[in-house]
Amino acid sequence: MGSQAYRGRFAPSPTGPLHAGSLVAALASWLDARAHQGQWLVRIEDVDTPRCLPGTGPAILQQLAACGLFPDAPPVCQSRRGALYQQALDRLVATGWAYPCGCTRQDIARALAASGQARQRHGELVYPGTCRQGLNGRPARAWRLRVDKNEQKSAFAQAVQALIAIDFIANSSTGLMETEVTWQDRLLGRQHQNVSRDVGDFVLRRADGLWAYQLAVVVDDAAQGITHVVRGADLADNTARQILLQRALGLPTPQYLHTPLVLGANGEKLSKQNGAQALDTSRPLAALNQAAAVLGLPPQTGDTADALAAWVNAWKDTACRPHAPLS
């Protein structure tokens, strides 16, 4: 992909200020865009409004600016883009990809237990497809994507890019078709996930009326013309679902690069939820040097602008960064 076509983004959730871990993703996405002579956008992912803190979006932009990271277009907020998400859901419903679900978490747990499939992944129950054939008189609570709509295999085959494959395989135990997605991550290499087994039909619109992260991200990446996604490795698990949604909506798939995580003293990922300290922007170069070290980039002295310029050059050199050559 040519450098002029490149468009990347940093998409933080305003659940708290940036910390050392989120700066790694911000710096990596900015460097990748600059190394490609492309555009770098910022999107505030505030679709999960109950978790968002007032005033945090502007505070994040101020933190980025203090570190010399300025977007090439005005930032957008997901909370103002509900009409786009509704259009996407309407399309998925019309094409048979989405269906209403009346299940509560208790319903899902009971259905899994009754079938001997008490499956749980990352604290979430793997949906067994209870409402695929209808609500049986119950009111709709949420909307889900049917991940094994295998009659679309020919359409997938026509649309799939190089390094991406979507296969429909028969489960030898159940005889049911399952969907496995394979893609190439620029750092992690070949990745694959059986979405049917590991996730099940996932939520597009929640029971509380809020839009699900997966749908919002896919719609926004396409609407903003994002060609390359550079984000933390904790989000790699979302990629297969997002590729499925892109295919179902007929949208392009960006290239993906998932960066190393910053771990806390307890060995867990540094995050706002486990009390990560807000980024100290009074010493931006020190904060940037810490982030650069995680990315395998050499330390810099002097001012922030010179340091960023040096890291852009180093980013282009495969000996100085952990991922594959620019593509």
Swiss-Prot record:
Record PANTHER family: GLUTAMATE--TRNA LIGASE, GLUTAMYL-Q TRNA(ASP) SYNTHETASE
Residues reported to bind L-glutamate: 9-13, 45, 213, 231
Co-factor note (free text): Binds 1 zinc ion per subunit.
Essential cofactor(s): Zn(2+)
InterPro entries, per the entry: Glu-Q_tRNA(Asp)_Synthase, Glu/Gln-tRNA-synth, Glu/Gln-tRNA-synth_Ib_cat-dom, GluQ/Sye, Rossmann-like_a/b/a_fold
Name assigned to this protein: Glutamyl-Q tRNA(Asp) synthetase
Family membership: Belongs to the class-I aminoacyl-tRNA synthetase family. GluQ subfamily.
Keyword Ion transport: no
Top EC class for this record: ligase
Transmembrane segments: none
BP terms from Gene Ontology: glutamyl-tRNA aminoacylation; tRNA modification
Binding-site list for Zn(2+): 101, 103, 127, 131
GO CC terms in record: cytosol
Gene: gluQ
Motif ('HIGH' region): 12-22
UniProt-listed Enzyme Commission number(s): 6.1.1.-
Keyword Cell division: no
Coiled-coil segments on the chain, per record: none
Binding, ATP: 272
Keyword terms: Aminoacyl-tRNA synthetase, ATP-binding, Ligase, Metal-binding, Nucleotide-binding, Zinc
Pfam families, sorted: tRNA-synt_1c
GO molecular function terms noted in the UniProt entry: ATP binding; glutamate-tRNA ligase activity; zinc ion binding
Chain location of the short sequence motif 'KMSKS' region per the record: 269-273
